[in-house]
């Protein structure tokens, strides 16, 4: 059987954000934080606090496919409201306008006032989402533009996933990234948070073999969804993220997962690394590296064996 673990490790490198992109994101984030603090101060309001959250904080962000944008979440936590009755909190539409006014003009594109955040779009191919929160009595409330203040705890989800990685293995983080890259390339109707939960709850460690860990994890996800097509958020408000999915959507997701599982089986059972990698390229795209044809690999092995220094006997001659 071909050993394609090293190909998966190279794939992980190719889908991971570069240091340059990471630094650019941090610079943009810090600039927005500065503008928001200044706007709040200039308008007689307590300066908010911030929390890096989402896939960037969990180190599971992947480079997007084609011209798609990648994004980060930076939570804006309003100060001065924790001791108030929630009925006295400002309207969610009001706090959205505050943050939008603070960041307008920071980029050429207008910021977008979405239901759950203010989105700032950058010409470099990424955007920063700014969800707004109030924390009270160990609960965190999100400013949803149409639903009002709703319970949502992104920090708890981040901590949940980080603990999952600690309890299991760093391999889990890589598998989440592989599956995110897969769903982007194959246009599978799953969100990043859903993939993160499914992979974490069904993770099968296989030390030194990401391809086998991924195969077993995908099979476990399939078994779980065929038993009950649910994906509960592990932190408040503990909702089923698959609520309302149509039968067709569920079938499409399961069929895509089964196709991935078959490709992994074929790749793992294949003797030729090049053929094995082609199965994976069909699922992950051209960012997955090509393996070396078996005859070339064997020739290199034979050459290395032939040109290896001989074992010396006690008299100094080659054995």
Regions found by a protein language model. Give the residues of each.
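Glycine- and aspartate-rich repeat motifs characteristic of hemolysin/RTX-like Ca2+-binding segments
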Residues: 73
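Short beta-strand-to-loop capping motifs
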Residues: 76-80, 203
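Soluble non-cytosolic domains of exported or imported proteins
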Residues: 23-27, 89-93, 166-170, 189
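Long, highly charged amphipathic alpha-helices
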Residues: 27, 31-35, 94-102, 174, ...
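Terminal (often C-terminal) interaction modules
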Residues: 1-10, 234-319
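Conserved catalytic core of two-metal-ion nucleotidyltransferases
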Residues: 19, 23, 36-39, 44, ...
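Catalytic cores of NTP-dependent nucleotidyl/adenyl transfer enzymes across multiple folds
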Residues: 100, 113-235, 312-319
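N-terminal regions immediately upstream of nucleotidyltransferase
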Residues: 1-69, 80-90
């Amino acid at each position: 059987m071909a050993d394609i673990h090293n190909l998966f490790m190279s794939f992980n490198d190719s889908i991971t954000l570069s240091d340059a992109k990471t630094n650019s994101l941090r610079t943009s984030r810090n600039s927005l934080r500065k503008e928001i603090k200044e706007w709040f101060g200039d308008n007689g309001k307590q300066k908010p606090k911030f929390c890096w959250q989402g896939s960037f904080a969990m180190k599971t962000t992947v480079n997007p496919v084609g011209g798609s944008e990648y994004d980060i979440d930076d939570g804006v936590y309003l100060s001065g409201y924790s001791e108030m009755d929630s009925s006295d909190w400002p309207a969610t539409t009001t706090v959205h306008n505050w943050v939008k006014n603070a960041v307008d003009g920071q980029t050429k594109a207008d910021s977008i006032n979405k239901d759950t955040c203010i989105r700032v779009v950058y010409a470099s191919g990424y955007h920063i989402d700014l969800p707004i929160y109030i924390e009270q009595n160990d609960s965190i409330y999100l400013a949803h533009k149409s639903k009002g203040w709703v319970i949502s705890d992104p920090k708890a989800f981040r901590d949940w996933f980080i603990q999952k990685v600690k309890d299991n293995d760093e391999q889990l983080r890589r598998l989440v990234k592989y599956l995110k890259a897969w769903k982007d390339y194959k246009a599978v109707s799953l969100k990043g948070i859903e993939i993160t939960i499914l992979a974490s709850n069904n993770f099968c460690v296989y030390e030194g073999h990401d391809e086998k860990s991924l195969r077993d994890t995908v099979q476990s996800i399939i078994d779980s969804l065929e038993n009950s097509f649910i994906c509960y958020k592990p932190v408040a408000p503990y909702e089923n993220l698959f609520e309302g999915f149509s039968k067709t959507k569920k079938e499409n997701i399961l069929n895509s997962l089964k196709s991935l599982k078959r490709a992994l089986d074929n790749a793992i059972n294949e003797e030729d690394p090049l053929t094995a990698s082609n199965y994976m390229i069909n699922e992950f795209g051209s960012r997955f590296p090509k393996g070396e044809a078996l005859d070339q690999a064997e020739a290199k092995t034979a050459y290395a064996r032939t040109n290896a220094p001989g074992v010396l006997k006690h008299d100094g001659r080659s054995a």
